[in-house]
C-alpha cells in the first residue's frame, strides 16, 4: 500500500464511505462516479494540504469542512436550498435541519475519517505536503469546475437567487480565513500514549458515531421545533468531538494504530448499517461495498501492527 502515493490514496478513498458504502450514489453511473471523485478527492486533499502547509490541527480541518459542505450541498447539489426536498425547518430559503445533518455527516465521514486514516497509513509523511504547489492549484480548479459546472447538470432546477451565491462565497471565504488563523497544535515532542487501548478507541468511536447518526436520523422526524432539532443534532456532534478530544484523538503525536482505531470506528458505523441501507435501496450495493471496506480495514490494521516497514 505504501507504494501508492498518499495523495492518490486519499483522492480515491475519500468518496467510498460517504457515497458507496452508505448507498447514497448509484453504482453503475460513470458520470456520477466521476463527479464524486472530482468532488470528494480534491476536497479532502485540499483541506489536508492546508492543514499541513499552515501547520494547523483538526480544528482548522473541521472549519474547512464547513466550507466543503457549503460548496458541495449548496453550490453544487443545491440541497441546502431546494424548496421541494428536505424542507424541515426551512427559513429564509434555507433547509436548516437538512443543513445541520449535512454538516455532521460530511465533517466526520467525508473529511475527518478519510484524512485521519490516510495519515495513519502514511505516518512517516504526516507533516509533509502531499502535492506540489502547482498540483494544489490544479486540484482547486478541478474542484471548482466540478462544483460550478457539473453541479448545474446534476441539479439544474430550483436554484436560489444570486444573493445566495454571494453569501455562500462569503461563508467559504470566512471559513478559509478563520482556519488559517486559529492556533495550531503544539509540536509533538514524543509519540502520544493513548489513555486507552486501541480496541477501546475503536468501540468508543463507533459508539459515538452510532449515537450521533441515530440522533441525526430520528430527530428530524420528531414533532418539535426545527430550532430544537438543529440544536440537538449539532450538540450531539460537538459532544462526540469533545469526547474524542478528551481522549487525545486529535493529539499531533497520536500513534498510527490509535489514529486507525478512531477512523475505522467512524467508518464502521456505515459497515454495520449497510444491510439496512441495502434493504432501503433495494440492491446489494451497500452491503458489497461494506464487505470490501471491512476487508480493506482489516488489511490496513494488520500492516500497521507489523510496523513502518510494511
Q: Model-predicted segments: where are they?
A:
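Extended, charged low-complexity segments
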Residues: 189-310
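Membrane helical hairpin/interfacial module
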Residues: 31-81
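Short, hydrophobic transmembrane alpha-helix segments
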Residues: 20-30, 155-158, 219-222, 275-283
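Hydrophobic cores of alpha-helical transmembrane segments in multi-pass inner/ER membrane proteins
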Residues: 37-48, 102-119, 167-183, 232-243, ...
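N-terminal signal-anchor module of multipass membrane proteins
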Residues: 1-45
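Short aromatic-rich membrane-water interface segments that cap or initiate transmembrane helices
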Residues: 90-105
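Membrane-water interface at loop-to-transmembrane-helix junctions
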Residues: 130-139, 158-167, 187-207
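C-terminal ends of transmembrane alpha-helices
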Residues: 18-23, 75-82, 142-159, 211-218
Amino acid at each position: 500500500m505504501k507504494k501508492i502515493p498518499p495523495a492518490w490514496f486519499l483522492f480515491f478513498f475519500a468518496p467510498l464511505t460517504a457515497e458507496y458504502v452508505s448507498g447514497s450514489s448509484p453504482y453503475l453511473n460513470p458520470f456520477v462516479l466521476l463527479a464524486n471523485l472530482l468532488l470528494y478527492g480534491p476536497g479532502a486533499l485540499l483541506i489536508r494540504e492546508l492543514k499541513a502547509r499552515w501547520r494547523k490541527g483538526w480544528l482548522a480541518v473541521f472549519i474547512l469542512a464547513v466550507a466543503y459542505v457549503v460548496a458541495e450541498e449548496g453550490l453544487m447539489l443545491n440541497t441546502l436550498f431546494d424548496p421541494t426536498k428536505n424542507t424541515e425547518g426551512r427559513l429564509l430559503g434555507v433547509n436548516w435541519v437538512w443543513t445541520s445533518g449535512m454538516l455532521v455527516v460530511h465533517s466526520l465521514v467525508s473529511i475527518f475519517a478519510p484524512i485521519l486514516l490516510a495519515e495513519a497509513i502514511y505516518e512517516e509523511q504526516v507533516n509533509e505536503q502531499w502535492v506540489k504547489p502547482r498540483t494544489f492549484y490544479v486540484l482547486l480548479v478541478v474542484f471548482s469546475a466540478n462544483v460550478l459546472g457539473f453541479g448545474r447538470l446534476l441539479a439544474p432546477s430550483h436554484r436560489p437567487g444570486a444573493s445566495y451565491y454571494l453569501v455562500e462565497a462569503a461563508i467559504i471565504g470566512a471559513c478559509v480565513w478563520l482556519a488559517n488563523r486559529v492556533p495550531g497544535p503544539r509540536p509533538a515532542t514524543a509519540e502520544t500514549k493513548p489513555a486507552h487501548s486501541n480496541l477501546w478507541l475503536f468501540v468508543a468511536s463507533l459508539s459515538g458515531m452510532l449515537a450521533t447518526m441515530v440522533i441525526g436520523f430520528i430527530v428530524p422526524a420528531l414533532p418539535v421545533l426545527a430550532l430544537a432539532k438543529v440544536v440537538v443534532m449539532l450538540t450531539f456532534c460537538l459532544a462526540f468531538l469533545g469526547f474524542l478530544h478528551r481522549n487525545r484523538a486529535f493529539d499531533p503525536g497520536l500513534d498510527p494504530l490509535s489514529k486507525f482505531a478512531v477512523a475505522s470506528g467512524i467508518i464502521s458505523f456505515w459497515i454495520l448499517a449497510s444491510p439496512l441501507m441495502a434493504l432501503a435501496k433495494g440492491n446489494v450495493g451497500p452491503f458489497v461495498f461494506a464487505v470490501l471496506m471491512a476487508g480493506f480495514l482489516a488489511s490496513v490494521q494488520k500492516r500497521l501492527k507489523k510496523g513502518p516497514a510494511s
